[in-house]
Structures are given as structure tokens and as C-alpha cells.
Design a protein with these regions (language model features):
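Acidic active-site catalytic centers that drive phospho-/nucleotidyl reactions
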Residues: 1, 20, 43
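Short, contiguous clusters of charged residues that form electrostatic/catalytic patches at enzyme active sites
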Residues: 4, 8, 77, 106, ...
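C-terminal catalytic/substrate-binding lobe primarily of soluble NAD(P)-dependent oxidoreductases
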Residues: 113-201
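Structured catalytic core of nucleotide-sugar glycosyltransferases
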Residues: 10, 17, 41-44
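Active-site-adjacent beta-strand anchor residues
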Residues: 20, 98, 184
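Short glycine-/small-residue-rich flexible loop motifs, especially phosphate/cofactor-binding loops
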Residues: 7, 31, 83, 152, ...
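Glycine-/Pro-rich loop/turn segments that contact NAD(P) or position catalytic residues
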Residues: 24-27, 31-140
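Conserved Rossmann-fold cofactor-binding substructure of NAD(P)-dependent oxidoreductases
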Residues: 2-15, 22, 26
């Protein structure tokens, strides 16, 4: 989490783009280093703090929860605040470029632009079709995964956030080639970015 160390590393390679696949705790530090080095930025997940009990962060978080209408620890506001800095520097910052978020938003934007006159509802269904042979295994960092599934779920309805207790809405879905899976409504960052960029849905 040292901007100068990151700058030294970036400057030693002189890339056009830094692809951040570190933990989301590092997002802002890496964005700061990219700005300092004049390098474009891309990540796969939005920022969240490592220490959610830090009083300074907690005060900002409580205010944001009231304004946004959801209480998950992760949201795009921290990174969207960098938009003007990157624009002024003539740089690009692509946020959430994994599968979800990432590909899911690209599919939705493409469908809205090329396939449909109107879209009333977007449901994003994501399942793990693999089997690691363990009773518990995640596709990414276990701590982040547990934070996601233990946070209140949320969805947007009529332009407003609706928050629900964690894993309180469940449905079954039969996926081609994977089979029937239990699905739970979770809060996830693509809901926030889709709500901002496709406001009529």
C-alpha cells in the first residue's frame, strides 16, 4: 500500500496500462500510483476498505449508507471520485472489468443499444459449476467472498435501492451444462453501475 513503491515498479516496466487484480483494499493506492506515473488503470472489483472499524472510514460509510440506501461495505463512490483526476490527466480508468462486474455490464449495454427498445428488468445469475472436492471453496479471495454473502442483499426497483437481510431471497435455476443451482440475491457492484448507466431499467 505504498504509492512510491508502486511508482518505482510501474516506472521500471513503463506499461501503458496497469491491470489491478490485487485485493480491492489496494484499489485506491494503485489508482494513485497510476495517476502519479501517467498510466491507464483497470481493475476487476471495486474498492472496499480492509479495516471497516476505522472511525474515519466509518463516518464516511454511515453517511454514504444514508445517501445511497444500501449498507454493503463496497461501492463505486470511492473510485468514481477519481473520474475527473483521470480525465484531467488524459488517462483512462476502467473499473470492474472481470466477469461480474464486467462482462455482465457489457452484455446489458449491448442488449439495451442493439437488441431491445426497452428493458424493464435485468437479472444477473451467476453460479459456480465446478467442484473442488472440498466442503468449502471459493472462486476468489475467501475473506472478500464471505463479506459479500454475509452483507445485506440489495436490488434496485423504480430507481431506488431495496435492501434485504443476507441470503433471504432464494430461488432455484437450471443452468445449461451445469444443472440446477440454489441462487441467493446478493448486493454486488454491477447493480450500482447498471443503475447509474441504464437508469430506465
Amino acid at each position: 500500500d505504498d504509492v512510491q513503491q508502486l511508482c518505482d515498479l510501474i516506472n521500471s516496466y513503463k506499461p501503458d496500462l496497469v491491470m489491478n487484480i490485487a485485493l480491492p483494499y489496494q484499489d485506491l493506492t494503485i489508482m494513485d500510483a497510476c495517476l502519479a506515473c501517467g498510466v491507464n488503470y483497470m481493475d476487476t472489483a471495486n474498492y472496499e476498505p480492509e479495516n471497516t472499524d476505522d472511525p474515519a472510514w466509518r463516518a464516511i460509510y454511515e453517511k454514504r449508507c444514508k445517501e445511497a440506501g444500501f449498507s454493503a461495505y463496497f461501492d463505486y463512490s470511492w473510485q468514481w471520485a477519481y473520474k475527473k483526476k483521470f480525465e484531467d490527466a488524459g488517462l483512462t480508468a476502467l473499473l470492474g472489468c472481470g466477469f461480474d462486474p464486467g462482462v455482465t455490464q457489457a452484455y446489458c449495454a449491448y442488449a439495451a443499444k442493439h437488441e431491445f427498445d426497452t428493458i424493464d428488468t435485468i437479472d444477473i445469475l451467476d453460479c459456480n459449476g465446478g467442484d473442488h472436492g472440498y466442503a468449502f471453496a471459493t472462486n476468489f479471495n475467501p475473506e472478500i467472498n464471505l463479506r459479500e454473502v454475509s452483507a445485506p442483499g440489495s436490488y434496485m426497483e423504480n430507481g431506488k435501492w431495496v435492501e434485504i437481510p443476507p441470503m433471504s431471497i432464494k430461488r432455484e435455476y437450471n443452468f445449461d451444462q451445469v444443472g440446477q443451482k440454489d441462487m441467493y440475491l446478493l448486493h454486488h457492484e454491477e447493480i450500482e453501475s447498471l443503475g447509474k448507466n441504464l437508469p430506465d431499467v
